[in-house]
Design a protein with these regions (language model features):
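Conserved core of the sugar-phosphate nucleotidyltransferase
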Residues: 113-193
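Conserved beta-loop-beta/alpha segment of the NTase-like Rossmann-fold superfamily
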Residues: 69-145, 149
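Short catalytic helix/loop segments, enriched in acidic residues and glycine
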Residues: 20-36
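A structural signal for short hydrophobic beta-strand segments in well-ordered beta-sheet cores
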Residues: 25, 147-149, 215
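N-terminal nucleotide-binding beta1-loop-alpha1 segment
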Residues: 1-19
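Conserved alpha/beta core of the MobA/IspD/sugar-nucleotide pyrophosphorylase nucleotidyltransferase superfamily
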Residues: 1-3, 167-242
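Conserved beta-strand segments of alpha/beta enzyme cores
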Residues: 24, 75-77, 212-214
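Conserved N-terminal catalytic core of the sugar/cofactor nucleotidyltransferase
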Residues: 1-5, 32-103, 194
Length: 242
C-alpha cells in the first residue's frame, strides 16, 4: 500500500502566510510542518512509499522532500499538477499510477492521529470497498464535508446536505483498494471533465451511487482541516499531542 498526499493547494484564507508556501508546509510544531505530521503518521503504520501532488509553490515541497525522506525513512515521488488552478479532482487523477495498486489517500491540510490510518488499514482486510474515515462524534457545520450513510454504505458525500440526516464528516483520509482504483480513475476523469472546479469527493459520489464506498469511524479523536488561521492555531495544539 502506497501513500498519496494531495499538497497542491495554496489556502487562500491563509494568505499572506501562504503567498510563497503551500499550506501543507505551514509549521505546526517547532520542528514539523503539517506535511511532516502526515508523513510521520503514514510511516508509523508502515506506509513508506509516498507520492505527493504539487502545484502552488511546488519547489518548496521539492526542497523539503529529502528532509522527509531522511527524517521518516520514506521514499517520496513528486507528482506535478500541470493545472494547479483546477480543483483536486484533477490533482488526484494525476496521481492515478500511484494509487493503482492500493493507497492511503491523505489531504495535505489535515492534522490527525495515526489511529485514523491504522483503523482504515485494519478495516480494509475484510472490506473491499473504498473506505473513508468518518468523524461521527463531532458537531457538524455547514462547511463540513458531510456524509449520509445507508444500509449499503455511503449514499451522499457533499457539503450541501442537511446536517440532520448526515452520519458525520469525512476528514480527508481514505483508503483506495486495488479493486476500486480503476473505477475511481474513471470517476475522477468524468468529474473534472464535467467541471474543473469539482472536488475528488464529487468522484467519490459516483462510486457511492454504485455501492463502492464504506466508512470507518475515527472515534472521538482530535483532528482538523487547516483552512484559515483559527484552524491553523487548532492544528498547532493538536500536533503537540501527536
Amino acid at each position: 500500500v502506497r501513500g498519496v498526499i494531495l499538497a497542491a493547494g495554496q489556502g487562500q484564507r491563509l494568505r499572506p502566510d501562504t503567498d510563497a508556501l503551500p499550506k501543507t508546509l505551514l509549521p505546526v510544531t517547532a520542528t514539523e510542518t503539517i506535511l511532516d505530521t502526515i508523513v510521520r503518521g503514514l510511516a508509523e503504520v508502515g506506509v513508506t512509499d509516498l507520492a505527493i501532488t504539487v502545484g502552488h509553490a511546488a519547489e518548496r515541497i521539492r526542497e523539503h522532500a529529502p528532509v522527509l525522506e531522511d527524517r521518516y525513512g520514506v521514499s517520496v515521488a513528486i507528482v506535478d499538477n500541470d493545472k494547479p488552478h483546477w480543483n483536486n479532482a484533477y490533482s488526484l487523477w494525476t496521481a492515478r499510477e500511484h494509487y493503482a495498486h492500493g493507497a492511503v489517500l491523505v489531504n495535505g491540510d489535515t492534522v490527525h492521529p495515526t489511529s485514523i490510518e491504522r483503523n482504515l488499514l485494519a478495516a480494509a482486510a475484510t472490506d473491499p470497498r473504498l473506505l473513508i474515515a468518518l468523524d461521527d462524534h463531532k458537531q457538524l457545520t455547514d462547511e463540513a464535508m458531510k456524509v449520509r450513510v445507508g444500509a449499503g454504505g455511503v449514499e451522499l458525500i457533499h457539503k450541501q446536505q442537511p446536517i440532520a440526516t448526515a452520519a458525520g464528516e469525512y476528514i480527508g483520509v481514505s483508503l483506495i483498494p486495488t479493486g476500486v482504483a480503476e473505477d475511481l480513475t474513471k470517476a475522477l476523469e468524468a468529474t473534472y471533465t464535467r467541471d474543473t472546479t469539482l472536488y475528488y469527493e464529487d468522484a467519490f459520489q459516483l462510486l457511492a451511487e454504485a455501492g463502492q464506498i464504506g466508512t470507518v469511524s475515527t472515534g472521538p479523536v482530535a483532528w482538523t482541516e487547516v483552512d484559515d488561521h483559527a484552524d491553523w492555531a487548532l492544528a498547532k495544539t493538536i500536533a503537540e499531542g501527536l
